[in-house]
């Protein structure tokens, strides 16, 4: 189980949105690279980065900030937001990115995701952002009629490294993860699922370590870490203890 600290980029700064609203952005750090290094120093093993401007624009909009992050941390980084073509994917992986997250393109062009998995095995994740059980696209600005599980099942057997599942209705408001829908998705597919949206406290960390959540690869935490609601040392100690039990 992995706890992924999140860096969301808007205008080259590290921000958090409330309910996916770009007009409700709180700046937490003007130096994303320094934030990435701080997360590494705290003991985190991975980093989750989202180019928010890119998600809306349909192309990379915070490339300089992402490259600075990649230079600042030795941790593997996964990036989503505005990655829509095989050339985009190849360009980022060649710069040292470990994993790309494909969201809107997974809805618009699922065959591209399948081709990307074939061409870049182990390096492609799918981001499914949901509102009211339906998939949202274009930086959460546009709703679709596609169901979450319906979309996820399109990629069974394709080699998708993980599905990052975000409940938009809980993102950035510290309401707790929607465990019901998250675990339903994890049970419905064989692809590892990463929970996102609403992680609020150590209780959520403990919840993701329960036996019925073992199909999850982990969870993403943003605002709860920035606001000090989750102590990194305590959270990582819980995860370490859980891993020790599994290998005992």
From Swiss-Prot:
The active site is at residues 8, 129. GO terms for biological process: L-histidine biosynthetic process; L-tryptophan biosynthetic process. Its main location: cytoplasm. Disulfide bonds: none annotated. Keywords: Amino-acid biosynthesis, Cytoplasm, Histidine biosynthesis, Isomerase. It is found in: Cytoplasm. PANTHER family: 1-(5-PHOSPHORIBOSYL)-5-[(5-PHOSPHORIBOSYLAMINO)METHYLIDENEAMINO] IMIDAZOLE-4-CARBOXAMIDE ISOMERASE. It catalyses: 1-(5-phospho-beta-D-ribosyl)-5-[(5-phospho-beta-D-ribosylamino)methylideneamino]imidazole-4-carboxamide = 5-[(5-phospho-1-deoxy-D-ribulos-1-ylimino)methylamino]-1-(5-phospho-beta-D-ribosyl)imidazole-4-carboxamide. NCBIfam families: 1-(5-phosphoribosyl)-5-[(5-phosphoribosylamino)methylideneamino]imidazole-4-carboxamide isomerase. It holds the Pfam family His_biosynth. GO terms for molecular function: 1-(5-phosphoribosyl)-5-[(5-phosphoribosylamino)methylideneamino]imidazole-4-carboxamide isomerase activity. This is 1-(5-phosphoribosyl)-5-[(5-phosphoribosylamino)methylideneamino] imidazole-4-carboxamide isomerase. InterPro entries: Aldolase_TIM, His_biosynth, HisA_bact_arch, Isoase_HisA-like, Isoase_HisA-like_bact, Rhodanese-like_dom, RibuloseP-bd_barrel. The gene is hisA. It comes from the Bacteria. Pathway: Amino-acid biosynthesis; L-histidine biosynthesis; L-histidine from 5-phospho-alpha-D-ribose 1-diphosphate: step 4/9. GO terms for cellular component: cytoplasm. Belongs to the HisA/HisF family. Its EC number is 5.3.1.16.
